[in-house]
Amino acid sequence: MNDFSFQFSRLADLVNANCSEILIVGGKVSLSRLNEAIVFEVSRRKTLRRLFDSTGNTGQENRHTISPQIGVIEQEVSSHAEAELRALLVANIWENSVPVHRMHGIKAFCIAFRNLTVLQFVTSHLLSDARAGYELTADVVDSYNKLADGMELQAANIESWNGDLELRLSSLDHIRYFSIAAIRILRDFVTFERGTTMSKFVPSARDILKHVFARNTLALVLRKRMELGVTLHPILLTAAVKAWAIHKFGRDKIEGSYRIADMYSFRRYASSDIQNAYDTMVMPFFPRIKLREDVTQTVLQLQRALDKEKHGRIFAELYRQRLYRIANQVLPKNFAIQLALRCIAKTELIITNAGTIELGHTRFGNVEIVDFFSFPQLFPPGRMMIIFNTFADELRATIVYDAQRFARSEIIKLVELMEQELQLIGDDSCRQIGAAIAANDPAEPQPRH
């Protein structure tokens, strides 16, 4: 086995190991295991350096030696995992515990980007060899296949987390897309016939490797999480929506400067810097429906659309009474008039979907919530979107708004009013709303498989 084959085989062994393996005890993250994982990852980095440095210079020119690229592996693979673990440790101390579903989301997030980093390294090396006229040996092909097998296993693990926890974090679909893309590119590289040019593989590789979500957004997420100590939920939601919009519409079709704010973040951080973490170009991609003018039919159609898309339920009366009153207090009167149901019924609504919630997080106070619930966009498309869901045993409201149309002070006021209104929701009123909905549509929502 030549030097490169040996090194790459060892590299595949190291990378396929789970860099962010953490023991979850009783639904919480073990602080001692977090520390152990950090120490282990630092040791892994040293092992990588010793491995490649020891075989990098033998006195003879070996163009297959990959020791010059060890900086890529060390900085982009290991440091990402270490940064994730340290951020988790900080979050654990700050919040006393990290919910299981958040841990799985962060873990999947880390694995997906490690896959992309390895893919970038492999692609660069293969292109360099192809230009130099080298052919892939059987040993090297075996190593590439071994690495691709590891990526497939990791992608399968993400699928199993989704099924076991009945969890659909906004990021998981996109993470799965990247993992599958990485596998496809690797398979393409190792199965081409000898003498075939590499050009047909280059565009697909570049499209993935230069994707904004794979590079810029990751740096933003890691940097801002470390600086501000913010939770992953709102930032990852922003990044996922942004990336999915680019994937669906193309970069040129994204317009408007959109930001995400949620009352949980504003309540914990009275700092103007918090908005910088959410400052990104976002154009949400959600299904749209055309509503009828009849009020009763509109409410029923809206409820059926939500049930069909998310297998959830909508508190129609809460939607009409509470949130419209909030909007009337904080927004100009002429704009608030446009929010009347008779006007909204004549235009398109974007149906929001914050994703399902983990089993065990289905209660708001003493009120049990079936699956999860969201509200349609209160404002004309492109202006504002309010997403309701439950997160970590509390009701969460996330606002996606156009920074060019709304002042930050208005959004903060809106968040405060929403929080006050939501605290006024009693058991009796919720039961009455639930009974009204059940009377209109008695069928229970079917769980997503």
Please give the residue ranges for each predicted region.
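Histidine-centered acyl-transfer/condensation active-site motif
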Residues: 86-87, 99-147, 157-168, 389-406, ...
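Short amphipathic alpha-helical segments
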Residues: 232-241
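Non-catalytic, low-complexity flexible loops and terminal extensions
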Residues: 1-10, 127, 131, 135, ...
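Alpha-helical hinge/cap motifs
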Residues: 125, 225-232
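Acyl-thioester-dependent acyl-group transfer interface
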Residues: 1-59, 81-106, 246-449
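Structured interaction and signal-relay segments at domain junctions
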Residues: 62-75
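Hydrophobic/aromatic-lined pockets within catalytic cores
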Residues: 128, 141-148, 226, 240-249, ...
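A generic structural signal for well-ordered alpha-helical segments
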Residues: 41-42, 225, 236
